[in-house]
Amino acid sequence: MPPPDPLPGTAYGFLSTYKPVLPPRTPWGPVEAGHSSRADAGGQLSNPPRPSTPRVLGIAIPSPLRRLFDYRPCRETPPGGWQPGLRVRVPFGRRQLVGVVIECRDDSELPLTDLKPVDTCLDGTPLPADWLWLCRFTARYYQHPLGDTLHQAMPVLLRQGRPLEARTRERWQPTPAGLETDPPGLARAPRQAELLEMLRQHPHGLGTQAILAQSFTREQLRALADKGLAGAREEPLTAPWKAGEPLLAEPALPLNSEQATALAALHERLDDYHPCLLEGVTGSGKTEVYLQLIEAVVGRGRQALVLVPEIGLTPQTLARFRQRFRVPVVALHSGLTDNERLDAWEAAASGRAPIVIGTRSALFTPLARPGAIIVDEEHDGSFKQQDGLRYHARDLAVARAHHHGIPLLLGSATPSLESLARARSGDWRHLSLTRRASRHAPARLELVDLRGRRRQGGLIPPVIETIRETLTAGHQVLVFINRRGFAPTLACHACGWLAECDHCDARMTLHRQPPLLACHHCDRRRALPDVCPGCGSGDLRPLGSGTERTEETLAALFPEVPVHRIDRDSTRRRDAFERVLTEVRRGEPCLLVGTQMLAKGHHLPHVTLVVVVNADAGLYASDFRALEQSAQLLVQVAGRAGRADHPGRVLVQTLHGDDPHLRRLSEQGYAALADQLLEERRAAGLPPFRFLALLRLESPREEAVNALGGQAAEALRRWIGERSLAVDCLGPVPAPMERRQNRYHLQLMLASSRRSMLHEAGAGLVAWLEATPEARRVRWSLDIDPQTLS
């Protein structure tokens, strides 16, 4: 098989200048009266020198239509003139929508008199040019409508038309008169005197909310102001860090030789695109390398963007960074209010926040002076959006770092096979940390045979005894089971009936808190039956174990020890996860029962035993990535053990202890298994040695989805043949779960060792679907570089 064709200097095979070949213009159908439309190439559109007052604005609007819409400018011209990146409010059918100007020109496909005018220009200055470039690149690469891409990439309040400007707060300080030893007018106002004394102790001032939190009132503040003893000044919520001020709040930690070597390699090229993979065992001090790289970047007056996989990691990362740095550090994630998110976005765009930390969507945060991008746990599947705009934040971080010409650092104890292939080929620099910061080596996976063994809550007696010994020694235990609920399903032992979802090809999960049956695919809920719906028997029993059942079993076995369950159900309330982790970090003996939420980067220094209830789920799955992902999860959860003063131990229960992949992982480690998986992928012609795109079709009508799938495959194969493209078209075939949410799902796979050809075929397929009337009655999406086949 020929090797893939990444362009020179790229990471995953795409350059910031990469432009897929688009198919010929297609009949787009009738144009809505009042504005013209042009095919949206998502960044491929040229923007000729604009006239001082353009007659036509090409505007991207949040819609599924892959085109720009032409409008006439409104009468009021923005202060800087009309230019790409300005947000505008426009009439669209019977609605008013917020769009973004992409083109300024003099011509349109419709007579200018037929074009609707823009209602309002919402910005005095355009949104950042680099942000607009990133959105256009994203739309082009992922074959997604530019208008919707822009919509998804900006905070909710900007989508609604809110101005992009810094919110301010009052900061109170004593006046020169208030600094006198015995200021007048306070003899009969003791609370005002106390307030003034508190302000004197804070020469840089105090915010209003901080003052009110100390039981003072706004009336007392106004009284001091009226007496000329205190005054307030307005400042941005995120105050800028001034060059020359101390950068660090606490000194950096000393580095071991491996950390120092990695940091020196990163310092070599701080002014250039420099992709590096930092492969470090769990607990090896990758975060300290991040911190010292950021210190160098911010010290040069630039900004750093740090991406973490899940919201659960953001509080601890944020706390660690704020503890180290005196500069503003802002966070962006889904747990923020709309105002908080806009404040952080604006602080980053203005440059007042030198450090930005966030989850997947934070990749779209504009930076005034970009200096470095860091992706922690780069292998994590959470970086891939699984609906709508199906982008991968890690891959876009590569493109963004290349565009800015800045260092990119991807860190992981279990790197993705895509990243490993790039590092081992020499496209990226490969940095390694093989030693833990503690004196103990990472714990080896000990396989425990489940065959023929009696279980309680999924645990066999020898494992329960090891848990008891660990707790008696005063340590903590993490029990990992990647299935929430009480049991995977409910079954009748008289007739074999199973609780199945009416809307999905899946079994319903039994929950005890509250008691119900729930489908984890469509969220359908059902009350627990008193008797079997099939035969009327009352012999209904749970099958298997979930987090709730294991929690219940452990609470009964160890009543004197707290049991903390951490899964999506138990952490729905804001800060619930962080409160549990705070309690666990106190060090008292306890049991943690959780899903993969616990496996991702959390520092649990008092955990010395990790138990994996069942390691078999990914061994024989239909998805070719399942083995890689299962191995990553096992190694990550194992890495929670023995991170401090005591060595760790990891027990992995399995029914397949003789599986060659599992044995290689336990005996030789992740790197050895990754080598084997890469060879298997190469032989099979799978990523990272080939590129994929997946067309997903779904409809409540099975015949509709099957008919369109067949037509699409036939049209695509004909189109590929006419252009002699080296692209394979596989399918259509039913999805692994054919019926989900009462809709039938069908898939068509495109595969090629030439990314440019894959994109050309994908663009042709999208054009055919948009021009085909039957496709309007079926929901469809094209997933570039799919991470799951479900």
How should these model regions be labeled?
Residues 723, 740-744:
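Nucleotide-binding motor/catalytic cores of P-loop/tubulin-like NTPases across gene-expression machines
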Residues 707, 741, 760-761:
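Short conserved micro-motifs at the rims of enzyme active sites and ligand-binding pockets
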Residues 1-412, 419, 424-440, 472, ...:
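Accessory, non-ATPase domains that flank or precede helicase/AAA+ motor cores in DNA-metabolism machines
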Residues 710-712:
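Long hydrophobic segments that form regular secondary structure
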Residues 103-105, 154, 234-236, 481-483, ...:
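A general secondary-structure junction signal
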Residues 564, 720-735, 776-784:
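Short beta-strand elements
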Residues 250-256, 260-263, 272-706, 718, ...:
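Inter-lobe coupling/hinge segments of SF2-like helicase ATPases
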